[in-house]
Amino acid sequence: MSNEDYGYDYDYLFKIVLIGDSGVGKSNLLSRFTTDEFNIESKSTIGVEFATRTIEVENKKIKAQIWDTAGQERYRAITSAYYRGAVGALIVYDISKSSSYENCNHWLTELRENADDNVAVGLIGNKSDLAHLRAVPTDEAKNFAMENQMLFTETSALNSDNVDKAFRELIVAIFQMVSKHQVDLSGSGTNNMGSNGAPKGPTISLTPAPKEDKKKKSSNCC
């Protein structure tokens, strides 16, 4: 039985988290992918926000629920709740700031300590429009991604270069893992409904999908 039989407008719901240092452009990547918008005066995210977008993969409707949080030290207390239920992650750095790239190893370690073992991961070198200020060689980042079994893309949230590609590749990778049963979406129990009323099987164990796809903000994370 598909999720549409339960009244849902998607077949799969994937929680994806954006991680990386503050100021690398995570929020603008999120808004560019979900609403095709860019805020030139975007400030560091306070707390957590998420947005959704539905795409089609192999004739299945995939609803990506993408979470974004600030990278400052004081927000790391929300780590366990932020990563819980995530089946995909994008680690973002700024190609013009070497420190943001060097910290990717920390973010990868934190992800692996708090997320499922089979979470799909992509590395994003954002702000490719600042090529004249490049501080991180593409080949170096690409090799780091390969060594750690991550997808790799350089993007520009400003002019939208490769943003769609980066998210779609991750979503497809998650879908392929689900198809191979490398990710357990069924939860516990034997019936078709989770305790929160969301159908089991093809749906990630989250709360039922929100009726609105607009960003939700909260200064105090779950």
UniProtKB/Swiss-Prot annotation:
Membrane topology according to the record:
Lipid-anchor
Q: Give the record's GO CC terms.
A: cellular bud neck; cytosol; endosome; Golgi apparatus; Golgi membrane; mitochondrial outer membrane; recycling endosome
Q: Which Pfam families match?
A: Ras
Compositionally biased region (Low complexity): 186-197
List GO BP terms, alphabetically. Answer: autophagy; early endosome to Golgi transport; exocytosis; protein transport; vesicle-mediated transport
Q: Per its Swiss-Prot or TrEMBL record, what regulates the activity?
A: Alternates between an inactive form bound to GDP and an active form bound to GTP. Activated by the guanine nucleotide-exchange factor (GEF) TRAPP complex, and inactivated by GTPase-activating protein (GAP) GYP3.
Modified residue annotations for N-acetylserine = S2
Name the lipidated positions (S-geranylgeranyl cysteine). C221, C222
What residue intervals hold the motif Effector region? Answer: 42-50
| Annotated TM spans | none
Signal peptide as annotated in the record: none
Q: Example GO molecular function term? A: GTPase activity
Residue ranges for the region (Disordered) are: 186-222
Give the subcellular location. Answer: Golgi apparatus membrane
Which family is it part of? Belongs to the small GTPase superfamily. Rab family.
What is known about what this protein does? Required for protein transport through the secretory pathway. Probably involved in regulation of secretory vesicle formation at the trans-Golgi compartment. Mediates the proper polarized localization of SEC2, a GEF for SEC4, but does not alter the exchange activity of SEC2 on SEC4. Plays a role in autophagy.
The miscellaneous annotation reads: Present with 4298 molecules/cell in log phase SD medium.
Q: What is this protein called?
A: GTP-binding protein YPT32/YPT11
Task: Recall the taxonomic lineage recorded for the source organism.
Answer: Eukaryota, Fungi, Dikarya, Ascomycota, Saccharomycotina
